[in-house]
């Protein structure tokens, strides 16, 4: 008599899983549907590249252990995990309804969003279930860290579950749960990120999820997060410097928002308060008047799932291709290729498979870097001189006549013969470097001028800022604010030749912030 498959433990053997369509991809991983033969069940497998993270295996195991102990109807069930080559595979329950983001995209594509994407009862029903899941996580000392429509999944019965909890977000932070350290890169878009997470001054708590929840509420009504049109550094700057966003932020056609009432808007504003202590808890939000409009899962099944895209419609089939990388590759037509060790390229079978199945690959820069954790920013070729010539330091209370000079200009490169230059190299020459000077006080309260160049198209604001921090010239806590203001200048150098901004590192002791004397402030200018 054969053993009941449901009683079997989940396999940690890669060969027991038949990988199928790609159902999601992002900066940190690829999610594929798969069939587990021993269990006779379809699952979702999230494949995360371990080479790209800075997390020890001990820390990973602790986080996986926490995930395995989470049992709640509004949290996606975690089954098991194991390592395949340089990837961590997380095996989870497959929810065939897809994500709420899939639903949003489907509605927008059909042009059915002119009076708002989802109506209030639908939003209330989905978000009430999300809050139930968040309340459970928060009570158990967990922070989700990535609440958004793309991580809210729907079952075919109308059930709502939060996905992407735990290891994937943990990996994205390099295992630094409280973010007391400085992250080297931002993974993905910061559109849903709370201000206190961006600032990286202190650790953050579960109230960061409440901010993301408020942004998600806007996303469900308008179809996108408020600052979705802007590049990441601009989003950081707008979030930190502007008043909190509202339902209207970034929406051109205000007519689409008319049907949303006061209780919905009030609920959003409660979540989007810059002071995390003023935000309600998940339990408090569940008692908010807006959630009286919530219905049951049968309502979602009828209202949403019957007109939602099927799993095959929203997925990309994977073509099997001989090779040795053991990785997925995105092709120019938007499909995916899986390269593994199954075929010998020298064999007749291998050559036949290559000729039939191989598609044109996207450029090297778009292959694995698109699928897995964001790589370190491209170097900016900034060189820190071994000896820094500095003038006499000035006391904090006085404006110096000549601040200390720090040169970060790149060394001159030998000229190439004209005939040896390619058209690509010639086009790079048209990118004129912008010479900048960052004036701020060092740890001894002495005023320094840090001179450097930024080449559009080659450098990134975050990459340059990170180099300034690595060189010990800028406090690590000021990464975000320096990068955001650098981005502001290089985007519009004609109108933003000089900006003065408050530093996240603040002032020490009895010092009083002063933007004129640059105490607790910095000035970035085009020189």
Swiss-Prot record:
Span list, region Disordered: 313-356, 392-429
Signal sequence, renumbered to the chain: none
Regulation: Activated following phosphorylation at Thr-185 by WNK kinases (WNK1, WNK2, WNK3 or WNK4).
Keyword Kinase belongs to the record: yes
Keywords in alphabetical order: Acetylation, ATP-binding, Cytoplasm, Kinase, Magnesium, Metal-binding, Nucleotide-binding, Phosphoprotein, Serine/threonine-protein kinase, Transferase
Gene Ontology, cellular component aspect: cytosol
Enzyme Commission number(s) of this protein: 2.7.11.1
Compartment list: Cytoplasm
Tissues expressing the protein: Ubiquitously expressed in all tissues examined, except thymus.
Sequence positions bearing N-acetylserine: 2
ATP-binding keyword on record: yes
PTM info: Phosphorylation at Thr-185 by WNK kinases (WNK1, WNK2, WNK3 or WNK4) is required for activation. Autophosphorylated; promoting its activity.
Catalytic reaction(s) noted: L-seryl-[protein] + ATP = O-phospho-L-seryl-[protein] + ADP + H(+); L-threonyl-[protein] + ATP = O-phospho-L-threonyl-[protein] + ADP + H(+)
Single GO biological process annotation from the record: renal sodium ion absorption
Acidic residues bias locations: 334-348
Cofactor(s) the protein requires to work: Mg(2+)
GO MF term set: ATP binding; identical protein binding; magnesium ion binding; potassium channel inhibitor activity; protein kinase binding; protein serine kinase activity; protein serine/threonine kinase activity; transmembrane transporter binding
Positions annotated as active site in the UniProt record: 146 (proton acceptor)
Residue intervals of the Protein kinase domain: 17-291
Residues where ATP binds: 23-31, 46
Superkingdom: Eukaryota
Disruption phenotype: Embryonic lethality caused by angiogenesis and cardiac defects beginning at 10.5 dpc. Conditional deletion in endothelial cells leads to cardiovascular developmental defects, leading to embryonic lethality.
Residue list for modification Phosphoserine: 324-325, 339, 347, 359, 427
Family: Belongs to the protein kinase superfamily. STE Ser/Thr protein kinase family. STE20 subfamily.
Function summary: Effector serine/threonine-protein kinase component of the WNK-SPAK/OSR1 kinase cascade, which is involved in various processes, such as ion transport, response to hypertonic stress and blood pressure. Specifically recognizes and binds proteins with a RFXV motif. Acts downstream of WNK kinases (WNK1, WNK2, WNK3 or WNK4): following activation by WNK kinases, catalyzes phosphorylation of ion cotransporters, such as SLC12A1/NKCC2, SLC12A2/NKCC1, SLC12A3/NCC, SLC12A5/KCC2 or SLC12A6/KCC3, regulating their activity.
Name of this chain's protein: Serine/threonine-protein kinase OSR1
Protein species of origin: Mus musculus
Gene it is expressed from: Oxsr1
């Amino acid at each position: 008599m054969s053993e009941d498959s449901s009683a079997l433990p989940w396999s940690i053997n890669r060969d027991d899983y038949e990988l199928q369509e790609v159902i999601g991809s992002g900066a940190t991983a690829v999610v594929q549907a798969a069939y587990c033969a021993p269990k006779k069940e379809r699952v979702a497998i999230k494949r995360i590249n371990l080479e790209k993270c800075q997390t020890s295996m001990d820390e990973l195991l602790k986080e996986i252990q926490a995930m395995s102990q989470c049992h709640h109807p509004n949290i996606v069930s975690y089954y098991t995990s194991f390592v395949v080559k340089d990837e961590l595979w997380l095996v989870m329950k497959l929810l065939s309804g897809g994500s709420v983001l899939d639903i949003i995209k489907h509605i927008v594509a059909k042009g059915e969003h002119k009076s708002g994407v989802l109506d209030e009862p639908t939003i209330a029903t989905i978000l009430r279930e999300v809050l139930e899941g968040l309340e459970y996580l928060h009570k158990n000392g967990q922070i989700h860290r990535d609440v958004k429509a793309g991580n809210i999944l729907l079952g075919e019965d109308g059930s709502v579950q939060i996905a992407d909890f735990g290891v994937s977000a943990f990996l994205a932070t390099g295992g630094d749960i409280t973010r007391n350290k400085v992250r080297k890169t931002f993974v993905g878009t910061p559109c849903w990120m709370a201000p206190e997470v961006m600032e990286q001054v202190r650790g953050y708590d579960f109230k960061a999820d409440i901010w993301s929840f408020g942004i998600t509420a806007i996303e469900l009504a308008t179809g996108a997060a408020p600052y979705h049109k802007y590049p990441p550094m601009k989003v950081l700057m707008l979030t930190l410097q502007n008043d909190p966003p509202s339902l209207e932020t970034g929406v051109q056609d205000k007519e689409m928002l008319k049907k949303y009432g006061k209780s919905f808007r009030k609920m959003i504003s409660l979540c989007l308060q810059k002071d995390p202590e003023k935000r309600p808890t998940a339990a408090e939000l569940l008692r908010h008047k807006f959630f009286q409009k919530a219905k049951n899962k049968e309502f979602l099944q009828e209202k949403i799932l019957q007109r939602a895209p099927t799993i095959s419609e929203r997925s990309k089939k994977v073509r099997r291709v001989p090779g040795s990388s053991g990785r997925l590759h995105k092709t120019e037509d938007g499909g995916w290729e899986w390269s593994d060790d199954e075929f010998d390229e020298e064999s007749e079978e291998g050559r036949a498979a290559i000729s039939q199945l191989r598609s044109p690959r996207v450029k090297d820069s778009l292959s694995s870097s698109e699928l897995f954790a964001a790589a370190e920013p491209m170097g900016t070729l900034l060189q820190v001189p071994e000896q820094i010539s500095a003038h006499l330091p000035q006391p904090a209370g006085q404006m110096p006549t000549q601040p200390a000079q720090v040169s970060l200009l790149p060394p001159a490169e030998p000229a190439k013969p004209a005939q040896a230059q390619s058209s690509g190299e010639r086009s790079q020459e048209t990118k004129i470097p912008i010479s900048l000077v960052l004036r701020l006080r060092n740890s001894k309260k002495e005023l320094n001028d840090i001179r450097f160049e930024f080449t559009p198209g080659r450098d990134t604001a975050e990459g340059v800022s990170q180099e300034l921090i690595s060189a010990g010239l800028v406090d690590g806590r000021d990464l975000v604010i320096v990068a955001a203001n650098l981005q502001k200048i290089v985007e519009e150098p004609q109108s933003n030749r000089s900006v003065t901004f408050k530093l996240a590192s603040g002032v020490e002791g009895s010092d009083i912030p002063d933007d004129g004397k640059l105490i607790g402030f910095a000035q970035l200018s085009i020189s």
